[in-house]
């Protein structure tokens, strides 16, 4: 769906993430000491990231496993739901949420998108955005004890994924 058309009918930009300064101030101190320096390098790189070279799209921006209905016996995705986070945002950001399920799934989605669209995505950018998103969520919920264990685990998963991609 063309972003200009979607804006004309009321689509809004996706909700911004926490700033790099907020990630440093609120998320990094919560990380185990062994991860802080690597996380700081990622936040620094994220802060310098230029605008998405492929522009903005109207997208789902919430394509993780909790918003997908799978038929595990058939190995098939039957549907997606919860479009509350849909909006206009950077194209590469649309590809980070599947990493909550599995990094291999993200790679398969990216490869399929490239095949169908003829566009090349930057895997490094996707990995960096994945880690930054997890740190942003940790920063956002740092003062909510009931969410902290899950957000910390997510941030550590994102950092490990970034490291596996050669980033951290």
Enumerate the predicted regions with their spans.
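Alpha-helix boundary/interfacial micro-motifs
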Residues: 16, 79, 99-101
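Pre-DFG segment of protein kinase catalytic domains
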Residues: 58, 79-82
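Acidic donor-binding loop at a coil-to-helix junction in glycosyltransferase catalytic cores
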Residues: 91
């Amino acid at each position: 769906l063309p972003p200009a058309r979607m804006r004309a009918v009321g689509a809004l930009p996706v909700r911004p993430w926490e700033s790099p300064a907020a990630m440093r101030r609120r998320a990094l101190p919560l990380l185990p000491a062994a991860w802080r320096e690597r996380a700081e390098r990622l936040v620094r790189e994220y802060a310098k990231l230029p605008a998405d070279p492929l522009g903005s799209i109207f997208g789902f921006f919430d394509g993780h496993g909790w918003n997908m209905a799978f038929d595990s016996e058939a190995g098939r995705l039957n549907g997606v739901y919860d479009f509350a986070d849909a909006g206009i945002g950077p194209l590469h950001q649309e590809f980070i949420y599947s990493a909550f399920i599995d990094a291999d799934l993200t790679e398969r989605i990216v490869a399929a998108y490239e095949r169908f669209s003829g566009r090349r995505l930057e895997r490094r950018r996707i990995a960096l955005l994945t880690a930054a998103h997890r740190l942003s969520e940790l920063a956002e919920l740092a003062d909510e004890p009931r969410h902290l264990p899950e957000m910390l685990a997510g941030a550590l998963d994102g950092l490990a994924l970034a490291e596996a991609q050669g980033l951290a």
